[in-house]
Structures are given as C-alpha cells and as structure tokens.
A protein has these predicted regions:
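Helix-turn-helix DNA-binding module
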Residues: 120, 124, 135-155
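Structural recognition of an alpha-helix C-terminal capping motif at a helix-to-coil junction
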Residues: 28, 42-49, 53, 61-73
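DNA-recognition helix of helix-turn-helix
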Residues: 72, 146-171
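A short pre-motif secondary-structure segment
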Residues: 129-130
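Acidic, proline/glycine-rich intrinsically disordered inter-domain spacer in sigma factors
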Residues: 93-117
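N-terminal module of bacterial RNA polymerase sigma factors
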Residues: 1-25, 190-192
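Arg/Lys-rich amphipathic alpha helix in sigma70-family domain 2
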Residues: 69-88, 105-108
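C-terminal edge and immediately downstream basic/flexible tail or linker adjoining helix-turn-helix-like DNA-binding
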Residues: 6, 161-192
Length: 192
C-alpha cells in the first residue's frame, strides 16, 4: 500500500505543508496533556524530526490520526509516569470581542468557564475525547488516536453530553448562564 501523502513527505515543501497545517492543533493537544509549553515544543520537534527521518519507511493510511496518536505517545513518554491534570486550551471557546455587548460577553464568559470546569470534572478519557473534538477531529479520527472503536467514542460522547447537561440543569445558575452552557455543549457535540 502506498503511504498517504507519500509525495508530500518526499519533498521539503510538502513536509513544510504538513508541519504548517498540523503544528498548532498538535501543540494544543500535547500541551493539554503535559501542561508545559517548552516540553510540548520538544515533543513536537521530536515527532516531526522522526517523521522526516522515517519518511521512506512509514506506511501511514491517515495522516491526521497518525500525527495525533504519535503526539499523544510522545507526550506520555515525556511525562514519564508523572500524572498532571490540565485545562482546556485557552482559545477552545473564543469570544469575538465585537460580537457581544458587555452583559452578553459576561454571560458568555461565565458559561464558558462553567462548561470548562464541568469538562475538567469528567473522567479523563471523556475529557480527552472532548479536547480532540475541540481540536477538530471527527469520531473516527478520535477513535484512531485513542486506539479504541468508533462506537466507544460515540458512546462516551453521548454519556459526556448527558453528564454535562445534567450537571448544568442541576446547578444553581441563572437561566441565561444555563442556556449559554447548554448551547456550548450542543455546539461541541454537533457543529465541530
């Protein structure tokens, strides 16, 4: 089988294209695992160096899941059995500055903070799936990155939606914040 993007991997320009297209989401993902920007950069340097050095030997069927799986393995290796929780990427839920009036912006930021806190309270595997979804991966790609079945991803996403929705509904928050939080959850699981 001919490796996917084999022609891209054979030229420096193609490799640069792969690097440019994937570095930022990979950096966010690795940094969310290890919570250390310098170490995340080192992990990605090693990943791309290895990709370039092994370009003639690799048999990659789908590039994006391969890169995320390699990044995850590199991050876990860099942690060397040290467990550390992390926050979602700072820009996971960007709020455009000119989109909202001050009250709407306040409610949106409050809703985002609540949803982030709720996501961080999920079991680690569900949190990781949501982070990958926020980085733009589809269920099939998430399954490949985490080396699980797509059905397991779908099940855990449904369970995460139920957990998050239940937690928001049972909170002592005002209706606007609840509505904003539920809307964000819906966006995470449908649009992205």
């Amino acid at each position: 089988m001919e490796p996917l993007n084999a022609s891209l991997l054979r030229t420096l320009e193609g490799f640069e294209s792969i690097f440019r297209d994937n570095y930022t989401p990979l950096f966010r993902y690795v940094n969310s695992i290890i919570n250390d920007e310098d170490l995340a950069k080192d992990v990605l340097s090693d990943l791309f160096l290895n990709l370039w050095q092994q370009k003639d030997k690799l048999q990659i069927n789908e590039l994006k899941p391969y890169l995320f799986r390699s990044a995850k393995n590199g991050a876990l290796k860099a942690l060397s059995s040290r467990y550390q929780t992390s926050e979602l990427p700072d820009d996971a839920f960007n709020i455009a500055e000119n989109t909202y009036n001050p009250f709407e912006k306040f409610v949106a930021k409050q809703s985002i903070k609540i949803v982030e806190d709720l996501i961080n309270s999920l079991p680690l595997h569900r949190k990781e799936m949501i982070e990958l979804r926020l980085l733009g991966l589809k269920n099939a790609e998430i399954a490949q990155v985490l080396d699980i079945t797509e059905k397991k991803v779908e099940y855990n996403m449904r369970e995460a939606i139920e957990q998050l929705s239940h937690a928001i509904h049972n909170s002592n928050l005002d209706k606007a914040t609840i509505a904003g939080g539920l809307m964000l959850i819906n966006i995470i699981f449908t649009v992205i």
